[in-house]
């Protein structure tokens, strides 16, 4: 909104159906005229009398223009909010004319004497929810790359690997880049390559008191198999 704009709100009736046109660039614009007629009560005659009507041309653009063309018809009582504009032009006879128009910011039916049913139009679907196309999930980094734990490239611990991972390249609960606990190769043993609940990736050593870290090498006896459980 430019500085110095004259904001105006007008309640009136459409004198004709809106006219929808498109500019060469493809932008939609709808033009319609409304008549706002004041009414006063004459106590002498005990009747309502109409005053001089105010006629204004209204211009509305883009998506709202298409909605206006599909929703409003001649005779409907509407509420128009916008900016008052003065425009001068010259007729074919060479006479100069000045008219006032409203650049519409918002418009809708008046419900004082009528009912209306609103049909909401979705705007840019998939921009939210549980990890929709533009984020909005629990830990999603946008769209199908977030949302549920361990999915694709997100989850609860994306970028730093699970709950305790230090370099777990985009893991979930335990997924390296595949979602299921077990890193890149889907292993379920003690080698969580990229992520997991405590996996530090290939770049972080486990503490000395870690029972998995203190196990003898696989195949040398004891409890050393990669798929064996450590003693407690």
Curated annotation (Swiss-Prot):
GO terms for molecular function: single-stranded DNA binding. InterPro entries: NA-bd_OB-fold (IPR012340), Primosome_PriB/ssb (IPR000424), ssDNA-bd (IPR011344). GO terms for cellular component: nucleoid. Residues 118-232 are annotated as: Disordered. Residues 123-186 have a biased composition (Gly residues). Pfam families: SSB. Gene3D superfamilies: Nucleic acid-binding proteins. Keywords: DNA-binding. Residues 1-111 form the SSB domain. GO terms for biological process: DNA replication. Homotetramer. This is Single-stranded DNA-binding protein. It comes from Corynebacterium efficiens (strain DSM 44549 / YS-314 / AJ 12310 / JCM 11189 / NBRC 100395). The lineage of its organism: Bacteria, Bacillati, Actinomycetota, Actinomycetes, Mycobacteriales. The gene is ssb.
């Amino acid at each position: 909104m430019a500085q110095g704009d004259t904001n105006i709100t007008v309640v009136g009736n459409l004198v004709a159906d809106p006219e929808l046109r498109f500019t060469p660039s493809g932008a939609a614009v709808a033009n319609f005229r409304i008549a706002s007629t004041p009414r006063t009560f004459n106590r002498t005659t005990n009747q309502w009398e109409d005053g001089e009507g105010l006629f204004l041309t209204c211009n509305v653009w883009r998506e709202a223009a298409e909605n206006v063309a599909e929703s409003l018809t001649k005779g409907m009582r509407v509420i128009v909010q916008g900016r008052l504009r003065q425009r001068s032009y010259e007729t074919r006879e060479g006479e100069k004319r000045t008219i006032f128009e409203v650049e519409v910011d918002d418009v809708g039916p008046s419900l004082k004497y009528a009912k209306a049913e609103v049909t909401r139009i979705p705007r840019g679907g998939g921009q939210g929810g549980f990890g929709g196309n533009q984020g909005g999930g629990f830990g999603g980094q946008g769209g199908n790359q977030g949302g549920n734990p361990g999915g694709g490239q997100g989850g609860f611990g994306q970028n730093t690997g699970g709950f305790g991972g230090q370099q777990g390249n985009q893991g979930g609960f335990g997924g390296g880049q595949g979602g299921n606990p077990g890193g890149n190769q889907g292993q379920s043993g003690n080698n969580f390559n990229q992520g997991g609940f405590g996996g530090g990736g290939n770049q972080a050593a486990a503490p000395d008191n870690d029972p998995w870290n203190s196990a003898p090498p696989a195949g040398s006896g004891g409890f050393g198999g990669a798929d064996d459980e450590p003693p407690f």
